[in-house]
């Protein structure tokens, strides 16, 4: 082995099987493709996922206390850009836009993706700050699978788990790389391509405006007020300001750490 830079750590840990984290609050259902997740305990059965405060799903899970994990088959790979590249904040009903349907879990009523190969209903039990993300710990209350799961194991003759290998690097268009172990079929899908591109660009601009507002503010309260005004100007929910400010503060701390480690 040879030593490489820490900036490559995330890519070293791929490929992984991502989950779609779904949640609902006040009638708004959202979801995001998440690669950073794991089982954390047998008894009680606890699952964990890392989510950044800026993500709309973060707000839904925080405020509802109920969420779900959904595992997808590779046949749904074309739905991934809606789930991983664009925010529910900017594309309301993005799961429906992806051509997917929502059903309700039998125990918690959590929103589940009807086309998923497996789903787990989770009750939020704790949130642990971990740098620029928070780790959400959820106790599993119910699990559902298609018939490809039998005898206590997935049948890979019929189930092709969606796996994620990471993003290609700039310059040039960025692609997310997905694959499945059956035949190692591979797909490269442009990041936020086509009609999703303007929404991804809008998200980048919004994050930039929020970061500038936070830098220009002398207190957190002042920053939240400034971001509320920005959200109102953009036709977005001003109540998201707290989460966006928290994310900007975490990013700033992360930038400082990187600067210190490289100096």
From Swiss-Prot:
Keywords: Flavoprotein, FMN. It comes from the Archaea. Transmembrane segments: none annotated. GO terms for molecular function: FMN binding. The keyword Magnesium does not apply. Its cofactor is FMN. Belongs to the flavoredoxin family. This is Uncharacterized protein APE_2580. It comes from Aeropyrum pernix (strain ATCC 700893 / DSM 11879 / JCM 9820 / NBRC 100138 / K1).
């Amino acid at each position: 082995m040879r030593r490489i830079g820490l900036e490559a750590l995330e890519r070293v840990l791929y490929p992984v099987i991502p989950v779609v984290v779904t949640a609902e609050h006040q009638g708004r259902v959202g979801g995001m493709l998440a690669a950073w997740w794991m089982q954390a305990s047998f008894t009680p059965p606890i699952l964990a996922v890392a989510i950044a405060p800026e993500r709309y799903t973060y707000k839904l899970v925080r405020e509802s206390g109920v969420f779900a994990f959904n595992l997808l088959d590779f046949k749904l790979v074309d739905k991934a850009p809606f789930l991983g590249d664009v925010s529910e904040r900017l594309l309301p009903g993005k799961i429906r836009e992806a051509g997917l349907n929502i059903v309700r879990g039998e125990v918690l009523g959590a929103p589940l993706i009807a086309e998923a190969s497996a789903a787990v209903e989770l009750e939020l039990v704790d949130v642990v700050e971990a740098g620029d993300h928070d780790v959400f710990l959820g106790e599993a209350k119910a699990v559902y699978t298609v018939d490809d799961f039998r005898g206590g194991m997935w049948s890979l003759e019929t189930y092709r788990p969606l796996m994620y290998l990471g993003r290609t690097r700039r310059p040039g268009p960025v692609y997310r790389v997905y694959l499945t172990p059956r035949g190692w079929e591979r797909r490269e899908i442009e990041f936020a391509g086509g009609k999703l591109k303007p929404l991804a660009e809008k998200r980048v601009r919004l994050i930039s405006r929020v970061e500038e507002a936070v830098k220009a503010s002398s207190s957190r309260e002042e920053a939240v007020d400034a971001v509320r005004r920005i959200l109102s100007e953009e036709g977005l929910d001003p109540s998201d300001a707290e989460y966006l400010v928290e994310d900007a503060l975490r990013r700033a701390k992360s930038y400082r750490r990187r600067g210190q480690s490289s100096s």
